[in-house]
Swiss-Prot record:
The record marks 128-129, 134 as: Important for interaction with integrin. Acts as a ligand for FGFR1, FGFR2, FGFR3 and FGFR4. Also acts as an integrin ligand which is required for FGF2 signaling. Plays an important role in the regulation of cell survival, cell division, cell differentiation and cell migration. Functions as a potent mitogen in vitro. Can induce angiogenesis. Belongs to the heparin-binding growth factors family. This is Fibroblast growth factor 2. Pfam families: FGF (PF00167). InterPro entries: Fibroblast_GF_fam, IL1/FGF. The gene is fgf2. It comes from Xenopus laevis (African clawed frog). Keywords: Angiogenesis, Developmental protein, Differentiation, Growth factor, Heparin-binding, Mitogen, Nucleus, Secreted.
Amino acid sequence: MAAGSITTLPTESEDGGNTPFSPGSFKDPKRLYCKNGGFFLRINSDGRVDGSRDKSDSHIKLQLQAVERGVVSIKGITANRYLAMKEDGRLTSLRCITDECFFFERLEANNYNTYRSRKYSSWYVALKRTGQYKNGSSTGPGQKAILFLPMSAKS
């Protein structure tokens, strides 16, 4: 490469397949690993939300969708339900998306993400050490229960 030249990356490989830089790859399914207890956030088909340590549990595969800058919805792929925080702080899941299904996603200094309710703005998505969800009214900055590491859920 000569000094001052510009190189562009192709969007397709020569054989027509996708490259690692293909558009839409950010939409790959994720697992949200909680620092508190080592559980993955699970959205069950019956609407319950809890944690599971079983990496093969299909209910931990989640679709995070940006709805605006810094705001995401979290959908359980197998359950086909959206994570929601109710007015009493309970975590549940809903078949149809509502204003209770949007969360501020923030990358913290320790490289974990937090998910804070947009509607109930001082409450966070959190899991207890037992794998049960933690009520939003009992959450706050600095707690291990609110820290999640997004991991690939492909395959």
